[in-house]
């Protein structure tokens, strides 16, 4: 059997592509999501879906305890879960700000806490891949400030943990994609979406499977020597 991988937001568009890639590479994959029906649709050998509310730190802790009992530990964590609320500053409601930061940053923080403990003593270089966003760096696009802040915080966590656990052979990287065709497109108006896609040099949005291929690379032995990096995927849009 391959490595044990945990993927958050597994039932979403990006999550399904990442799960498919890791399964194809021979890993046992545990997928977290609140979408029980979506997880059920993904049932196949090597995949275990767990209904986990990532807004609750206690639920995250309990889920990893269950994984420890079931599979003995964790080799790979992909923090993929996230959302983008579109309220404009300064009229962002407090609860929306808190939900944005909790799902995009705090959930990943708590998953890292739990996963790193279960990575101790495992063979080889263990991996954490955080799915960030090009929006944390490109201020010419439409992303609202609480979304940018949540993803920038995630990338700082990536760098801190990469340095902190380098000698423990835990490699931590972020992937920061630009426009990728997922259900989150639904939060955008037609004109905003059309303008954003038109800005992409290839004239199209990227596909979840393309991002998943980068996750697969970082998780593979070829990615062992990469840690502390924020890998920006945007077709060269923001080269200066």
Regions found by a protein language model. Give the residues of each.
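Canonical Rossmann dinucleotide-binding motif of NAD(H)/NADP(H)-dependent dehydrogenases/reductases
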Residues: 2-29
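Alpha-helical segment proximal to the catalytic Tyr-Lys
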Residues: 117, 159, 163-167, 224
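Active-site helix of classical SDR
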Residues: 112, 150, 158
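Short C-terminal tail/terminal secondary-structure segment
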Residues: 216, 227-240
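Active-site loop of short-chain dehydrogenase/reductase
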Residues: 3, 73-74, 119-133, 167-170, ...
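Substrate-binding pocket helix/loop in short-chain dehydrogenase/reductase
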Residues: 88-89, 93-101, 185, 196
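A conserved structural motif in NAD(P)-dependent oxidoreductases
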Residues: 200-211
């Amino acid at each position: 059997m391959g490595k044990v991988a945990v993927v958050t937001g597994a039932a979403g568009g990006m999550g399904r592509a990442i799960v498919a890639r890791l399964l194809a590479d021979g890993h046992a994959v545990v997928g977290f999501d609140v979408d029980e029906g979506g997880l059920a649709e993904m049932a196949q050998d090597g995949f275990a879906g767990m209904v986990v509310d990532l807004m609750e730190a206690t639920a995250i802790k309990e889920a990893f305890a269950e994984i420890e009992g079931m599979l003995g530990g964790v080799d790979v964590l992909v923090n993929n879960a996230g959302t983008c609320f579109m309220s404009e500053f300064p009229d962002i409601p407090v609860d929306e700000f808190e939900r944005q930061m909790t799902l995009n940053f705090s959930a990943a923080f708590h998953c890292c806490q739990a996963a790193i403990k279960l990575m101790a003593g495992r063979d080889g270089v263990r991996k954490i891949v955080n799915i960030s966003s090009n929006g944390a760096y490109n201020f010419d696009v439409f992303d609202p400030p609480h979304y940018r802040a949540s993803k920038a915080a995630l990338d700082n966590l990536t760098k801190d943990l990469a340095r902190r656990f380098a000698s423990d052979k835990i490699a931590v990287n972020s992937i920061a994609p630009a426009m990728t065709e997922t259900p989150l497109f639904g939060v955008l108006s037609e004109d905003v979406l059309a303008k954003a896609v038109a800005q992409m040099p290839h004239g199209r949005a990227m596909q979840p499977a393309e991002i998943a291929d980068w996750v697969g690379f970082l998780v593979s032995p070829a990615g062992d020597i990469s840690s502390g990096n924020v890998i920006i995927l945007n077709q060269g849009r923001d080269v200066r």
